[in-house]
Amino acid sequence: MQAIILAAGMGRRLGEYTRDNTKCMLPVNGVRLIDRVLGQLSQLGLSRVVIVVGYKGQNLIDYIGHRYDDRLKIEYVNNPVYDKTNNIYSLSLAKDKLQEDDTLLIESDLIFDDSLFRMILDNPYPNLALVDKYETWMDGTMVRIDEDNNIVNFIPKKAFKYKDVDSYYKTVNIYKFSREFSQNKYVPFLDAYSKALGNNEYYEQVLRVITLLDNAELKALPITNGAKWYEIDDVQDLDIAETLFADKSKLMQRYNMRFGGHWRFPKLLDFCYLVNPYFPTMHMKDELRANFDILLSEYPSGMYVNSLIAAKYFDIRQKYTVVGNGAAELIKSLMERVEGRIGVVYPTFQEYPNRKEQTEIIGFTPDNDDLTYTADDLIRFYADKQLSTLLLINPDNPSGNFIPKADVLRLAAWCKERGIFFVVDESFVDFSEDFRNNSLLHNEILQAYPNLAVMKSISKSYGVPGLRLGILASSDEELINWTKHDVSIWNINSFAEFYMQIFGKYQKDYDRACQKFIAERERFMARLTDIPFLRVIPSQANYFLCQITEKYTSEELTRRLLMDFNILIKDCDNKDGLENKNYVRIAVRDQKDNDTLVEALKTL
């Protein structure tokens, strides 16, 4: 068995990263792709490795030098017209060598787990294309396969249809060809195809023709063990690859620095970010899809219309309402406006205190392991602190502590009497029991307490974090008007605007989704409490704060779940008030996902 690596391409899409070297010289987490693959190949007992070079080929040859002489016999084939041809020509230059032995054919811009080579070599079938079920990040040649893993056809990029993706597999660009297959099938068709259509084509096109034969002799080998691989064509691919293949000591850091965008990692089960799994309904999503074209091509409305739509959304007055590009935009604006001392309950959602000087923050940390507190606790603590502003997140993040509405109104009255500006973030309130009666977003409440500002994210309970929506509501019209002028006139997009426009039709569905969520949270908590090393704190939000009581630190458990099960939870060890106390936060998802997490925890 030999290996042929195609490494002649210029890698133009990688820009400055390939200005002086070909793609396989690209370092991923400090290790060049060529070193990684040669290290993997050196474990296989191959007769030789043939590398087809072209662009900056001498740099590659000089870099490899004699470093692998004790493990691999390396030969080179040069493609002098790499800038005018495609990989079909590179392979045709190596066709004589291809026919001399059974061959692993590999493209040089891949990074993958060691297990993939063993998987394809250990399979007894002589001619295989390694494939993986289509995921949204994949680009390039696809195949369809039958129940016996015969390749029914190859689908080039120009024939790709999104409506057919459920039947697609992506070629990983690792192939195993027997010597006989290369001699009798592949090379004869390679010669004919190149002669007929030229050298600016792809070698997969030859395989596409071969699969049309009655006895093609080529099968697919789907990846079934969850092994990782990635094809690096541009700088974003490089960033994702460095996350997927990060060293275990840096893995959490790589995910945490992203602050979302986890659709790029389809196998990741995200228990870190907080979203209602039961809303929007499929019918609402269908309506959004049906209007995709017009929403994509039309400008959104400005602040006047969007504050009107948001006010309708929550049945409050337009003049009391300002819309934000997520609550985060409004938090920034609000925190920059408030002056003086601000009372903050710790641990908390850091976006608020991060916007203030530490000297301005008067922190209150509950003196109990469950981090519970009441309105009376806050009144007692802050009675002599000369606050200008009091912040309450209710339910709180990350503790899930909830203060009943009547007590929140008592706090509002207490603040009003003392001239304290009272900010209530109720982004998670619709996850609380009796949620229909817990919100402060009512005209009469806002009118009665002009010192009150209510912040609400339209991401969490509404299940649409990608739309980036939030509101700030207050009868302090000076505050609302100031905020409207502080943010951009076009601060939300057409999709977010349309979502708010149609939400009223789905209000009953939303209520049912919240009720279903509350039932699942109760069931999930019962299952989590069976894990012997977890102490689960009751919650009225869509997450549980859990203390790890034995076996692991919070960092160790978080890393184990990510490395062994592709499950991401939140390590709270760096949160103010939770340092070195071994807390993690676990989101509540749907029953299937929640049970997956529980079963993973049981194995640890």
Describe each region flagged by the PLM.
Residues M1-T18:
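N-terminal nucleotide-binding beta1-loop-alpha1 segment
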Residues M1-I5, V31-T103:
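Conserved N-terminal catalytic core of the sugar/cofactor nucleotidyltransferase
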Residues M119-N123, T372-K385, P398-S461:
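Active-site pre-lysine segment of PLP-dependent enzymes
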Residues I240-E298, K385:
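N-terminal "arm"/small-domain region of PLP-dependent enzymes with the aminotransferase-like
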Residues E336-L392:
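PLP-dependent aminotransferase-like
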Residues Y169-T171, P280-T281, G302, N451-I537:
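PLP-dependent aminotransferase class I/II
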Residues I518, I531-F565:
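Conserved PLP-binding catalytic core of the aspartate aminotransferase-like
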Residues D113-L197:
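Conserved core of the sugar-phosphate nucleotidyltransferase
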